[in-house]
């Protein structure tokens, strides 16, 4: 007889006990991080075999849209720290601004073989045009599109972290609005935040120049808000 342990009351109760027990919780968290790193490294092998051919196509498409955009998170970190993609990275990250974002962007990326797979968003419907993160893929290479908001003084976006119970924690990250500039990366003029090192230090801390295999955004230094009930997810 086959038992579905994920719907078994004993298993679910044991899992809840272990996860909330102060002695066993750190062990479970360490195992979770180890699984995440192993999965990421496997994806990184595929990513690095193809990214040097695919990246110029994506940049060219972004340039054709006539909107402000920039590389961010791990893609920016690799560009500034290593002048290359991070060895253990398995996707790209781009930012656009909510005042220029439009839903038809998905059609534009479809023209180069990237289809929108799913998106994260805020549950609070009173917050308009804020908090979107979209995932695109051509089957091998993936990129995240973060929709930033901006004011005269600041820019901010939301990131989402899923726990083992599939609950999404929404994390608001904020930086000073310093504008954008272009740098040469992979032989291309690529937009980045002005003062990119300051942008990275705000996010990753003063040790941003030292590689760290495992990272999640709860470790960020520029969190302005964190909420375990506000994240939502949908397939597109």
Model segments located where?
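Catalytic metal-binding acidic patch
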Residues: 83-105, 187
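Terminal accessory/targeting
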Residues: 2-4, 17, 41, 211-213, ...
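Residues at the C-termini of beta-strands that transition into short coil/loop
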Residues: 73, 98, 149, 194
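Conserved catalytic core of two-metal-ion nucleotidyltransferases
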Residues: 40-63, 110-190, 198-203, 214-236
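Active-site nucleotide-donor binding segment shared across nucleotidyl transfer reactions
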Residues: 59-92
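Helical scaffold of the NTase/Pol beta-like nucleotidyltransferase catalytic core
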Residues: 6-71
């Amino acid at each position: 007889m086959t038992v579905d342990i994920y719907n078994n009351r004993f298993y679910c109760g044991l899992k809840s006990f272990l996860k909330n027990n102060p002695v066993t919780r750190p062990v479970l968290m360490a195992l979770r991080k180890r699984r995440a790193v192993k999965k990421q490294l496997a994806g990184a092998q595929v990513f690095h075999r193809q990214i040097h051919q695919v990246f110029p196509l994506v940049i060219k498409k972004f340039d054709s849209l006539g909107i402000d955009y920039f590389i961010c998170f791990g893609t920016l970190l690799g560009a500034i720290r290593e002048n290359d993609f991070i060895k253990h990275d398995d996707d790209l990250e781009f930012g656009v601004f909510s005042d220029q974002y439009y839903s038809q962007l998905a059609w534009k990326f479809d023209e180069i073989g990237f289809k929108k797979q799913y998106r994260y968003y805020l549950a609070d419907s009173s917050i308009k045009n804020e908090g979107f993160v979209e995932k695109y893929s051509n089957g091998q290479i993936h990129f995240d599109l973060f929709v930033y908001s901006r004011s005269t003084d600041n820019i901010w976006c939301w990131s989402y972290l899923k726990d083992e119970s599939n609950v999404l924690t929404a994390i608001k990250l904020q930086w000073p609005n310093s504008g954008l500039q272009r740098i040469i990366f992979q032989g291309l003029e690529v937009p980045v935040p002005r003062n990119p090192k300051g942008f990275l230090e705000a996010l990753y801390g003063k040790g941003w120049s030292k590689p760290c295999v495992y990272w999640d955004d709860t470790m960020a230094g520029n969190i302005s808000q964190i909420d375990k009930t506000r994240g939502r997810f949908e397939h597109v």
